[in-house]
Curated annotation (Swiss-Prot):
PANTHER family: PROTEIN TANC2, ROLLING PEBBLES, ISOFORM B
Family to which this protein belongs: Belongs to the TANC family.
Protein name: Protein TANC2
Skewed-composition ranges (Low complexity): 1787-1802
Primary localization: other
Taxonomic lineage from the root: Eukaryota, Metazoa, Chordata, Craniata, Vertebrata
Entries under InterPro entries matching the protein: Ankyrin_rpt, Ankyrin_rpt-contain_sf, Dendritic_Spine_Reg/Scaffold, P-loop_NTPase, TPR-like_helical_dom_sf, TPR_rpt
């Protein structure tokens, strides 16, 4: 069949030829490929019978690859020989292909190259290329695949029918090919294992004959083929599992090739071939690109044995990813485990001296020059053995040739790694000279060895070691394994792109770039950064001459590569290289010092070393001594004579001496005569003697000669199996049996050393050379025939079952060419030998095109092999995998390989074929500047005007890269034909584009040339137009040059007349082009040529704006110096500063501000630079702007503030910065923070910090407000990854709230919060501790004890817990005793207890500190100054109000309103707080808490919010309309939705909910006891206010215990009320809203009767609260409460001193207007924001009202005093208060009284003041401090302390106040209401009438209306502004005015409201009068109330 098909082919018949669908450069689909391969296998495997189609010539592509064709065979080849003759010839020559024996072999038994490959690749099979591993886990081809270079897995006969493994994943990167290459390295242990059983199997097969043995043997041979692993013990790793680790870059298939100097570059093919590399290419094929898919991939199916092995590999233990670079495995047979190293210390000493010299011309390295066998390799190996890589010597040193491989102990330490000793393989011999000298020389050697970081051996018979890519890869792999360079290794692991850069694939494509960027530059940078030791490092390279044997046609050898790269080496990286004397010229370009080892006569040290070696050998062997002694004795004379004789013969060759002594030692030489005639005279004679002894007859040598021929011809070491198969490949009849083969190989074992990877290597390069080449006059006996070896190897490749991989195809071509078996046949047959060779290779493999386009053959092409592949049918237009799948011609044109280009063009390659980017070969050549290739292509009519996909022609590419000669040539080319065809693109267009291209790149010569072209009319060539823009980029020459900063070109163009103002196609003039890029020198040039520095572009932007936008500081400064206007705006109203802020360029911002740029400029959208900076997100710019006066609360036209923008853009650093600078958290802020957990954490943490700050200062109520508000704002869902953070934060907030509640005597809530914290964090000892303290405070000692025991379990070493545990145990005992002695203690006891508690572990701050661990650390760290989010710290440091403001701006306006109004706005808030907090510590609690509940609201946080806090504001804090308050009211219509602000809260938890919560709190024995038993209540812990008051007044403890009780009860009731808010009366009674107010008053009175002032304060606070209901919580009628309230108010008033008021500038409250407001507040507080009173009286009133900052101080202080009491009360008033307070905002922060609602809470008369965080820091502090009984003025106003307590708050005596209050109880309440306009408005709620206190925004419509008018003005926008601005609206001028107007107007609305609510009005009026009187009295009193509303109300 084959003969027939051959005939068909020769006659031109296409006998069913299978084209491999190669036309398009794509291989046939896998299925077709499969069939063709299968058919091939069947052809050779099944009896050798194959169909014609199988054997038909299969060109890779449809294009006939050979001249042979059907019609014109004769014409091209001349008269052909007869078909039979030609066929016979081919059959004879190729008969081996069809050997009959083959027919007997079952297909499964056939040896296939693929199987071999499998074996080769098995080790690598499971490995991935370094790069591919990084990107995907592509496995390299299965070991059985010819594509893989892994050693084949041993298989039995049945295993042969293997199919290829599945194709790797398509995701593999280009690097995937490397896996093959690198994979070729395998593990020693694996190979050992494999070869063991492979060998056994092969023996069995051997007896069977046929080819079976090949398979098994081959497999083991292959396994040895590429065998190298630094990890000897490691077995193969699964490629899939451990991709990177396994790629051993060891050159798997060592190429054994013939030395160059013996033949003219016989192994040139090696340059392009390296199995690994091919694998590399093969891996590329795996990339599933149709054109690149490997044809063999899908084929062989795995056989059993193979599968087992795979499994074994797959389950290898996992190892973490490692560097993907794997060093080559070097093994040097001449360095054995028995080698001896003697002397030569002088060499190391000289090397050391030279490398350390200061002479830069020689200190970069040393060249060691010597003849073959003179010890160069031993010197290098000695240094390696002593270096950090010494453990690798076990790989380098071979086992002794005489040791049986069976006995090799892979784990044995090689002597090379140890210090020289008698037993060491390389021992240092005695060296002449003094011991000191030897010591120094020894030190030099060890110093050098310690500096060695990498090494490389070049071995001619292992081609891979001679190739530059492998060299680079190996050196990098060893460098990263050097202990001195761990930083380099870490960098490679850290930067995978560096590993990719060093992958074998990258090294093949551009070894110089890989070495420079992957090795030298990283090392240099690490050295500069001092990350690697500051010392010299050495790279060793042995045998540079050997690498020359494999010099590629194109590309570098290792020595030429080093010559080019040495200039880039850092001074501390040295080289030590060796070279043979005969080839030392190749190193002449290396600037190294040279040391010669063969100048024996010149160097006495050499003689001494030889002498020492001879002495060592004689003394170490008795056999030698016996054989050289004449009479059995060795005397000095004999020794001297012998030594001299041997030294003379050796001429310095240690190899000669070693081999000679070996012969003597074994008895082959006996020197009994003194003539020594038997001693061989040269190394050649030594080898001859050895062979004569080994092969005494010619026939015995002939038996092994084929083995030697194959070994000599191979490019890399082969395994026994491979050699066996190659030998049998040449036999047509009767194959060699395995046993016979093994016997022959055993005879060669001393010459072919088995390496650790089971491959065979010649014992020494010199022996290999001796076998193939002899000098003249030498005997030619034992000469081998390399051609025969090439022939056998070619036959062997041809007999592979499947398709060869790329590398194997290249190798096959190499061997075919070297074999040249058709030599002389062409004349006989009439067919040229080259065509026959082409036929041969085409029959033998399918992947010719892929081999031609393989990576190595592209970058280091082998011209001859490439020609052979093309003759065989390779597709010359095949698309490669590089340069965008460019055809081969494109790649060769790009690389400048003229010969390859000519070859491709010769065979008709498409001259205009383009890559995927549209670039043709002409474009690539022009871009690279290869004029010769451009000329070649143009001669072939390449299209000059072809445009790539970027629209660029070849001329433009040449101009872009500055190739003037190419530009000139292309312009002179004929463009007419192309132009006519395309029509559109003309030569003039190309020239214009070339001008712009050259100008942009700064090529002045090309620009000048193009501008000087003759005019069009003069010649055909058209000159470029200097002011025109091109059709490609749309640039003019000047805009292009200016934009790229090409100053010289700009000068040239301007000199040539370019127009300065000529715009490009987009309308940009040169000035803008250059400013945008920051080239100020060109700006200067253009300005000097008349450009306008302030010209504007289409958008109105000036050059200064452009430069600022781009961040070019130098250009900005230059433009400013040139007079650029800093104030100009573009069409959007943006200035240069705006642009700089928008882009975040701090340096430019600083420069512009320093030059006077306005930081407050607003653009057309109202955005200031701060807004834009917050949008961009640069915290430093934001900080700078704020520090330089930018308005932090500025609102743009869309209602956004900088903080809101930062939150919206998720710029966390800016958010933190703005919060630190005092930005307020408004509703918009919360809204924008939705779904942004990171921002929410920041905002909540900010609230928590504020709370912590207040807590530290003792302002418990304010702190609780913050915490409560934060809890209210907690996101309900979507925590995601931040769940843990949020949980911790919530736990912290709950615990802090618990502490605050406890300090406020709200023990039930305290306990509840602690319980909730425990639910969230069951193992929290802090939560147990907090709950225990709460329980202890409520006298639940047993329960407290249980919690403490749990806490101590969780934290046994906490002293606080231990201390409290002891106390509680003691208390339990006392209680038991008391119970035994007497009935339960009267209610008073609790108070006693309370004081105790307070005094005990709980000093005011103690709580925080006791459990401070977490909370303080996490939240207290921030500066206290930052506490107030809303207010500027400086304005009211002490006030929580500012903070409150931000809280009020909680996402929901209502919420904010709620917060501000009820919690902050009114005492209710505080009461509510206690209630709500009590009610539900959780959300419910908070929600229900609504304002009151959340301590945050109650706290100054909310006070600060007052501006926005005011009910309206809060309700609609951002809505700007009071109605929101109403809206909130809507939600809880019953009472003026006191929850008003809390509307949302209430929604979340309906009032009922809150009620229940409060109830539960009330339920707590304390609270409810309070309600039930007033008398007890006093004793019980009081509300925070009362508690605080208690502390100061405990001693005095007024008889008013009842009021205190009331207070306490009120908290409980208040809470209840809260929930019940609808019925204000109930609230009053429960909470004692009025009671609260009154209650507070009472409790305060009771507590502080001694110091009435304080009591007054508390009372006044109570009054606010109390106003809610007619009946006070304690049960007193509202009148009573009022009385107490008024008394409180009076007290407060009185408490205020002029000094106090002044202390707080009115501006603190946003202006004096606030004070003026105050007076009005009396009547219409609720309705409007009142500016500060203008008149003194007003001021006083204000102060009494607490409206003024001073008042706020007072308020604050009272707050701190009464917070506990207030807490209880607020809950009650809360309902009304909410609604009412919504109406008014009195918080100091708020400018208007409308803040009253806030104020209410903030301002409770004095109590409210205490509760409210009014900026009065001093007052506040005092109040805190003065809590102690010592200061009578605990009332809360700074001056109060000085005043005697007898003076009531407003200067009215307590009694008077009470009296007035009682009569006006309702009025007073109302007055409270009046104070807060809301109160009046609240009338809608039942308790509102009496509840003036409830400042809830106008509950009544009238209130609302009024509120809308006044408050809206203020609350609406003003409120918002207030909310935003720390000083409040009043602070802002216009806003202040508005507030003033509002406040003034408010009186009328108040009246209106009063009318609406006559009763309320009456009360209000009365109250107002009283207040007026009080205020007058207050004025009389030392304190002049500056506070507007609170105190007046009181």
């Amino acid at each position: 069949m084959f003969r027939n098909s051959l005939k068909m082919l020769l006659t031109g018949g296409k006998s069913s030829r299978k084209n491999r669908s190669s036309d398009g450069g794509s291989e046939e689909p896998p299925d077709r490929r499969q069939s063709s391969v299968d058919s091939r296998q069947s052809r050779s495997g099944q009896g050798g019978i194959s169909t014609e189609s199988d054997c038909a010539f299969e060109p890779d592509y449809a294009v006939p690859p050979l001249p042979v064709s059907e019609g014109d065979v004769e014409q091209e080849l001349g008269p052909p020989p007869s078909v039979d003759e030609a066929a016979n010839t081919l059959m004879t020559r190729l008969g081996f292909l069809l050997g009959e024996k083959v027919t007997e072999v079952q297909p499964s038994d056939q040896y296939s190259m693929e199987v071999q490959d499998e074996n080769q690749t098995s080790a690598i099979t499971q490995r991935i290329s370094p790069c591919s591993t990084l990107t995907s886990s592509t496995a390299s081809p299965p070991a059985s695949s010819p594509c893989s270079t892994l050693p084949p897995v041993s298989t039995n006969a049945a295993a042969k029918d293997c199919s290829y493994g599945a194709v790797t994943s398509p995701t593999s990167t280009l690097e995937s090919r490397d896996s093959g290459i690198i994979a070729t390295l395998t593990n020693y242990s694996e190979n050992m294992e494999r070869t063991k059983y492979v060998g056994e199997g092969s023996k069995e097969l051997g007896s069977g004959g046929n080819l079976k043995p090949w398979q098994s043997q081959k497999s083991s041979m292959d396994s040895c083929l590429y065998r190298v692993d630094e990890n000897m013990a490691a077995s193969t790793y699964s490629l899939n599992k451990i991709p990177e680790r396994n790629l051993e870059t060891v050159l798997s298939q060592s190429v054994q090739s013939i030395p160059l100097y013996l033949m003219p570059r016989p192994n040139s093919v090696a340059a392009t071939s390296s199995a690994h590399l091919e694998d590399l290419a093969y891996l590329d094929e795996q990339r599933h690109t149709p054109l690149r898919t490997s044809l063999r991939m899908p084929r062989q199916s795995l056989s059993g044995a193979r599968t087992q092995q795979d499994l074994r590999v797959r389950f290898a233990p996992y190892r973490p990813p490692d560097i993907s670079l794997k060093p080559l495995l070097f093994e040097v047979p001449s360095i054995t485990t028995e080698s001896v190293f003697v002397g030569r210390d002088w060499v190391f000493h000289e090397i050391d001296a030279q490398l350390q010299s200061s002479n830069a011309s020689v200190n970069q390295g040393v060249v060691i020059v010597g003849n073959i066998g003179f010890g160069k390799t031993a010197i290098i190996s000695r240094l390696v053995a002593l270096s950090c890589h010494g453990t690798r010597m076990r790989q380098i040193a071979s086992d002794s040739p005489h040791a049986s491989p069976k006995h090799v102990d892979a784990n044995r330490e090689l002597p090379l790694t140890q210090a020289p000793s008698a037993h060491s393989s390389i021992t240092s011999g005695s060296c002449p000279g003094t011991p000191e000298m030897r010591r120094r020389q020894e030190e030099a050697m060890r110093r050098l060895a310690s500096q060695v970081v990498a090494y490389h051996y070049c071995q001619a018979d292992n081609a891979y070691t001679c190739l530059v890519p492998e060299f680079v890869h190996n050196v990098a792999a060893l460098l990263c394994r050097s202990p001195q360079l761990t930083a380099y290794r870490e960098q490679l692991l850290r930067e995978p792109h560096l590993q990719s850069m060093l992958s074998l694939r990258s090294c093949v494509q551009d070894p110089m770039a890989s070495f420079r960027r992957g090795v030298l530059e990283p090392l240099e940078n690490l050295h500069k950064e001092r990350k690697i030791p500051d010392e010299d490092f050495i790279i060793l390279i042995d045998g540079l001459n050997e690498a020359e044997f494999h010099k590629p046609d194109y590309g570098d050898t290792i020595v030429s590569f080093l010559s080019k790269m040495i200039g880039n080496f850092p001074s501390w990286l040295k080289l030590i290289v060796t070279v043979r004397t005969s080839l030392q010229e190749i190193t002449k370009l290396l600037p190294f010092h040279r040391i010669f080892l063969d100048r024996l006569e010149e160097n006495e040290a050499i003689d001494q070393d030889l002498q020492a070696y001879i002495l060592h050998r004689i003394h170490s062997s008795s056999e030698i001594q016996n054989n050289i002694s004449l009479n059995g004795k060795m005397d000095n004379t004999t020794f001297g004579k012998l030594s001299s004789h041997l030294k003379t013969l050796s001429q310095g060759s240690y190899l000669y001496l070693k081999l000679t002594f070996d012969l003597i030692e074994k008895g082959y030489l006996v020197l009994k005569s003194s003539s020594y005639k038997v001693v061989p005279v040269s190394l050649s004679e030594v080898y001859l003697l050895q062979c004569n002894m080994k092969f005494p007859t010619q026939s015995s040598f002939d038996r092994v000669m084929p083995l030697l021929n194959v070994a000599v011809a191979s490019l890399h070491p082969l395994t026994d199996e491979h050699i066996f198969q190659a030998i049998n490949a040449g036999s047509i009849e009767g194959t060699l049996e395995w046993e016979d083969f093994q016997q022959r190989m055993e005879n060669l074992s001393m010459f072919l050393i088995k390496r650790r990877d089971m491959t065979r290597m010649f014992v020494h390069p010199s022996f290999r050379e001796w076998l193939i080449w002899r000098e003249e006059g030498e005997k030619t006996k034992f000469l081998c025939d390399p051609r025969s070896g090439h022939t056998l190897l070619a036959f062997w490749f041809s007999r592979q079952e499947g398709k060869l991989n790329r590398q194997q195809t290249i190798e096959l071509g190499h061997h075919i060419l070297k074999a040249h078996i058709f030599k002389g046949l062409s004349k006989k047959v009439g067919v040229s030998s080259s065509i026959l060779q082409g036929l041969w290779i085409s029959y033998s493999t399918e992947g010719l095109s892929m081999a031609l386009a393989s990576l190595r053959n592209l970058y280091t092409p082998n011209i001859k092999v490439s020609r052979l592949l093309i003759l065989g049918g390779a597709n010359i237009n095949y698309r490669t995998e590089v340069l965008n799948n460019a055809p081969i011609l494109c790649v060769q044109s790009h690389l400048g390989y003229t010969e390859m280009v000519a070859l491709l063009l010769e065979f008709g390659a498409n001259v205009d074929a383009s890559s995927e980017s549209g670039l043709t070969p002409l474009g690539y050549a022009a871009a690279a500047g290869f004029l010769s290739i451009v000329v070649l292509l143009c001669k072939k009519r390449a299209k000059v005007d072809h445009l790539d996909k970027n629209g660029q022609c070849a001329l433009v590419h040449a101009a872009l890269r500055g190739h003037l000669e190419v530009v000139k040539f292309l312009i002179q080319c004929d463009w007419t034909m192309a132009g006519q065809q395309q029509g559109v693109f003309k030569k003039s267009h190309a020239i214009q584009q070339a001008l712009i291209a050259a100008a942009s790149m700064g090529y002045t010569e090309i620009v000048s040339y193009l501008l000087d072209l003759p005019e069009k009319d003069e010649e055909e060539v058209e000159r470029a137009q200097i002011n025109s823009f091109d059709s490609l980029w749309g640039e003019t020459a000047l805009t292009a040059a200016a934009g790229r900063g090409k100053l010289d070109v700009c000068r040239l163009l301007l000199e040539q007349g370019a127009a300065v103002a000529q715009p490009n196609r987009r309308g940009a003039v040169p000035l803008f082009s250059t400013v945008r890029q920051g080239h100020w020198q060109i700006v200067d040039l253009l300005l000097t040529h008349g450009a306008d520095v302030n010209m504007a572009d289409k958008q109105g932007r000036t050059p200064l704006m452009m430069a600022a936008s781009e961040g070019h500081l130098g250009t900005v400064d230059f433009l400013l110096a040139q007079g650029a206007s800093i104030a100009l705006m573009d069409k959007e109203g943006l200035t240069a500063l705006s642009w700089a802020c928008l882009k975040g360029h701090l340096s430019v911002v600083r420069s512009l501000v320093d030059n006077g740029a306005a930081t407050d400029h607003a653009d057309k959208n109202g955005r200031t630079p701060l807004d834009l900076a917050a949008f961009y997100g640069d915290a430093e710019v934001v900080q700078f702007l704020v520090d330089h006066g930018a308005m932090i609360e500025h609102v743009d036209y869309s209602g956004m503030r900088p903080l809101d923008r930062a939150v919206g853009c998720r710029n966390t650093s800016v958010v933190v910065t703005l919060l630190k600078k005092g930005a307020k958290i408004g509703p918009a802020t919360w809204a924008m923070a939705t779904s942004k957990p990171d921002i929410m954490i920041i905002l909540l943490s900010k609230l928590m910090e504020e709370g912590d700050m207040f807590y530290k200062k003792g302002k418990v109520k304010e702190a609780a407000q913050r915490y409560q508000y934060a809890l209210k704002k907690f996101p309900r869902e979507g925590f995601g990854e931040d769940l843990k953070t949020f949980r911790e934060l919530k736990v912290s907030l709950l615990l802090n709230l618990s502490r605050c509640r406890r300090k406020m005597n709200d023990f039930g809530m305290a306990e509840e919060f602690a319980t909730k914290a425990l639910e969230l964090k069951p193992k929290s000892y802090e939560a147990y501790y907090a709950r225990a303290r709460a329980k202890r405070s409520s006298r639940q000692f047993a329960a407290a004890l249980e919690d403490l025991k749990e806490a101590i379990k969780l934290c046994p070493n906490n002293r606080e817990i231990q201390r409290l545990l002891m106390r509680v145990e003691e208390e339990c005992r006392q209680m038991q005793q008391q119970q035994q002695q007497q009935p339960p203690p009267p209610p008073q006891q609790p108070p006693q207890e309370l004081p105790e508690e307070e005094t005990e572990p709980e000093p005011q701050h103690e709580d925080i500190y006791s459990v401070q661990d977490i909370f303080e650390e996490e939240y207290l760290e921030q500066d206290v100054e930052n506490v107030s989010i809303g207010l500027q710290t400086e304005a009211r440091p002490s006030q929580g109000l500012p903070v409150i403001q931000s809280p009020p701006s909680s996402p929901a306006h209502r919420d904010s309103a709620y917060i501000s109004s009820s919690p902050l706005g009114s005492h209710q808030v505080f009461d509510f707080r206690s209630n709500s907090s009590v009610g539900s510590p959780t959300r419910q609690g908070y929600q229900s808490t609504s304002p009151a509940l959340s301590p945050t609201h109650q706290n100054s946080h909310y006070r600060p919010s007052p501006p926005h806090t005011s009910p309206a504001h809060q309700g609609a804090s951002y809505r700007f309309s009071p109605p929101p308050v109403g809206g909130q009211s809507k939600e809880y219509p019953s009472p003026p939705p006191s929850p008003l602000r809390r509307g949302p809260q209430y929604r979340a938890s309906p009032p009922a909910e809150s009620m229940s919560v409060y109830r539960s709190q009330s339920g707590s024995p304390v609270r409810y006891q309070q309600e039930t038993n007033v008398s007890q209540l006093p004793g019980r812990p009081k509300s925070p206010l009362s508690k605080m008051a208690q502390r100061p007044y405990q001693m005095p403890q007024l008889p008013v215990a009842v009021p205190q009780q009331g207070l306490r009860l009120q908290p409980a009731k208040a809470q209840i009320v809260r929930s019940n808010q609808p019925s204000s009366a109930v609230h009053s009674s429960t909470v004692i809203p009025t009671g609260a107010y009154g209650q507070v008053a009472h409790s305060m009175a009771s507590k502080y009767q001694s110091s009435q002032g304080d009591m007054g304060v508390s009372q006044s606070r109570l009054v606010y609260q109390g106003s809610i209901g007619g009946i006070v919580g304690d049960g007193r009628p509202v009148q009573h409460v009022q009385a107490s309230l008024s008394a409180g108010a009076i007290c407060q008033h009185g408490g205020l001193t002029k000094e106090d008021l002044p202390q707080r500038p009115s501006s603190a409250y946003r202006g004096g207007m606030r004070y003026s407001q105050t007076p009005q507040i009396g009547r219409s507080q609720s309705a409007s924001y009142y500016p500060v009173c203008h008149s003194k009286l007003d001021l006083e009133r204000s102060s009494s009202q607490l409206g003024s900052p001073d008042v706020s101080h007072l308020i604050r202080r009272p707050i701190s005093v009464n917070p506990n009491e207030i807490k209880p009360h607020p809950p009650t008033p809360r309902p009304l208060l909410h609604s009412q307070s919504v109406g008014l905002r009195f918080s100091p922060s708020s400018n208007s009284i409308s803040s009253t609602s806030n104020l209410t809470p903030t301002f409770r008369p004095s109590s409210s003041i205490q509760q409210m965080e009014i900026p009065l820091k001093p007052a506040y502090d005092r109040s805190c401090d003065e809590l102690s009984p010592v200061s009578p003025t605990q009332g809360g106003y700074p001056s109060e302390p000085t005043r005697s307590r007898t003076t009531p708050f407003m200067g009215i005596i307590d009694k008077t106040a009470r009296t007035q209050q009682y009569p006006h109880l309702h009025q007073q309440n109302r007055t409270w209401a009046v104070s807060s306009v809301d109160t009046v408005l609240s009338p809608t709620s039942p308790g509102n009438l009496p509840q003036p206190e409830s400042f809830s925004p106008p509950s009544s419509i009238s209130n609302i209306a009024f509120y809308n008018k006044t408050n809206n003005a203020q609350n609406g926008h003003l409120l918002e502004d207030d909310y935003y601005s720390p000083h409040g609206m009043l602070a802002n001028g216009s806003r202040g005015d508005l507030l003033e107007r509002v406040s003034q107007a408010s009186s009328y609305p108040d009246v209106k409201v009063a009318r609406t609510l006559p009763v309320a009005q009456a009360y209000q009026d009365n109250l107002y009068r009283q207040l007026s009187r009080d205020s007058r009295q207050g004025q009389t009193s030392p304190i002049k109330p500056k506070r507007p509303f609170v105190e007046s109300n009181v």
